[in-house]
Regions:
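A short, N-terminal "cap"/entry segment at the start of jelly-roll beta-barrel domains
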Residues: 1-84
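Short, conserved beta-strand element in jelly-roll/cupin
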Residues: 83-84, 88-95
């Protein structure tokens, strides 16, 4: 998938979340420059692989076969004792996941 397509899908999903009054954490909107300015205070976000996952499952056609998800919390047995995760998954009408 091209980065521009991924960025468009993320924008679409942010709009969907806002319309549903499902509020993502502030770091969901950080730019690459914002991330570069952050230090170890954001290690948990990186260590636990939080954030956006956009996939077409290798199909090359996200519109037909794909899934978007945002991970807000994720357990990491190597670093902490959280035994759970919290994710929101988004699919389009007719999309196969």
């Amino acid at each position: 998938m091209k980065r521009s397509e991924i960025n468009n899908i993320i924008c679409e999903n942010k709009r969907l979340c806002n319309e549903a009054r499902f509020y993502l954490p502030i770091w969901a909107d950080w730019t690459p420059e914002d991330w570069a300015a952050k230090g170890k205070e954001c290690a948990e976000i990186k260590d636990n692989c939080l954030g956006w996952d956009i996939t077409d499952f290798g199909s090359g056609d996200f519109a037909k076969v794909g899934l978007s998800l945002f991970t807000m919390r994720n357990g990491n047995p190597a670093l902490d004792h959280k035994p759970y995760c919290e994710k929101i998954m988004m699919i389009r009408d007719g999309q196969i996941t």
